[in-house]
Amino acid sequence: MIQKEMEIYNLFTFQIDLDKKLLFEKSNDQKNYSKIRTHYFKHKFKNKSAVFLNKNLIKNSLNKVLLNFSDFVSGAGIDTVFNQIIDEDPEVLNYLKQVKKDLSKENNATSQLTFNVTINPKNTLANFFEGFNIYLHFNEENNTVIGSFSLQWHIKKTDLFSETKNIAINNLIHTFCKNNMHEISFMQIINCFSKTKINKHGEIVLKSCAFKQKWQNVVAEKYPFSTASKDLEKINDFFDALFVMLLLVCHLNKNLLWLCEKTDFFEWKPSQKTALFKANDSGAYLARMLLFLNDWYNENQAITTADIENVNEVEDIGKLVEKYSTNQPQKLSLNSTVYVLQTKQKQFFLKNDFFFNNNEAKLFFLITMKPNVFGLDDTAIANNLNLKKISDFFKEIDFNDEDILNDFKQEQEKLLVRRTFNQLLFMNKNTEILSVVNDKQKSVIHNIVWTITYSKAIMLKAFDYSKAFEKNRTSDPSLLRSNLTVINRLRYLSEYFQNASLKYDLLYTKAKQYMQIDKFINDMIRKVNHEDEIFGKFKERIYLSLGIISAVVFGIVEFFNCVWTILTVSQEVVDKSVLDPRNIIFISIGTILVLFLLVTILVFMTRRLYLFEINKKHKN
């Protein structure tokens, strides 16, 4: 055995742009302290546990921003889901435990907060997840909030084949999600379960869910185990548990977004209809979670009775959410996986690669960093490989072959990001990370998560700004200059995050390279400049056209004035003067010239408008 212990973390990053510094102004307002204390000591009697509040803790940090971060902490039955925090230090919430600064980040940045939520060991979710961490970075200078939710798997110490199974399931389920969901968001999850029926008792019938049936078909094909029914049931339960956790973090993300936009921290009602989270399997738990969110929206939004009566499917819940949702995007990045492997025997990574002299270590590296070798990447669902064939493939790899060994070493050096006395750190193009360590230190994991969070948040911002640019390009080009300003600001924000990454700045740089962030930003800047230049020229043409029209009108008036002065007309002989051949010639020539000028202008303007419409349709 090469490993003493292995951990798997799934990271989902988010970012929130603030229109004003309302959030940061509220966090410094000490008038709210009495409201906070009163509000949460009321909940103490519902939860039958004391809630300790420390004025200095609230004053010196942004902890009170989190006081209503998750209103379901006071809901009925929540104590069956999460472990309550019992600590000698004051805690703001019963279930959110703040990670100390010296653990969460080596530079003790005051703008960063890390919270840990532990799953109750008696809950069915504990079979799959130990809990999750919430990483929050408040950047007042750039008016932004970014962060990640890090789900930690519950893994028992097993052999390589069992570890391979866990890694394969992780790859497969996230590949499945990526192929069926273009983003991780509350609405996307609701849409996946959209045709799931709700019976007359208000219970969600997951057996009617086509999305879950699709997953079960994939699993049955890819994992033909000898104890098929037992293993398939466990993998299906993991699928349900993962979506319960995703719904939880999407709900938390939604609440944080509202905190950033609301003018009052304490205007929400705690959920009274929260379904008891007591279920003996994750499928029933998932159904309860969907119903809980339905209750939450019904109580916290101005939903009519007619709206509630029309809820017959999960899709109808989604319609309510969409109808009463905020305008700002509420999405999480697609999953990044961090594998942390603690070695069985201490290694000296800086001077040798003895660790990879073991074939088991080589295979572990390949299946985590090069899953495509075994068909565990995006092609896993399309091809005919299954876990049994992969295990047979393991045995066929001959690392004594010089070519195979050289290829392995090249891949190892290519993906190596950091080498120290106690750690080897690798990252592949999918931003999946393998950290091989002698001693499992939480600070190492936190620093890795922070670095990936920074890089993915920049990409999320770039995508959001790109969508805003495309919208303004067609609807209001006058806003392109403001788009250019915020996009240029991304460069400085990227440098700021790189400096915040400290010793892991190489990991941050590598992640940016894999995601092609700099290229995306530069291409977007060129595109915005090009469109702004076109819009500028279009405005110049409009002004020029107006100038020409004004000149033409003025010229025509002057022309007739001139003609009138040279005509041989007198007041006494007006009738005879009109019939004078010389006057008729002057008037005819002038009329022809004016008509020719007007026709030329009309043809020119019509042609320009026609070409403008053609270009507009082509761009769309």
UniProtKB/Swiss-Prot annotation:
Keywords: Cell membrane, Membrane, Transmembrane, Transmembrane helix. It is found in: Cell membrane. Its main location: membrane. The chain crosses the membrane at residues 66-86, 238-258, 546-566, 584-604. The keyword Chaperone does not apply. It is a multi-pass membrane protein. GO terms for cellular component: plasma membrane. InterPro entries: MPN337 (IPR054979). The keyword Cytoplasm does not apply. This is Uncharacterized protein MG241.
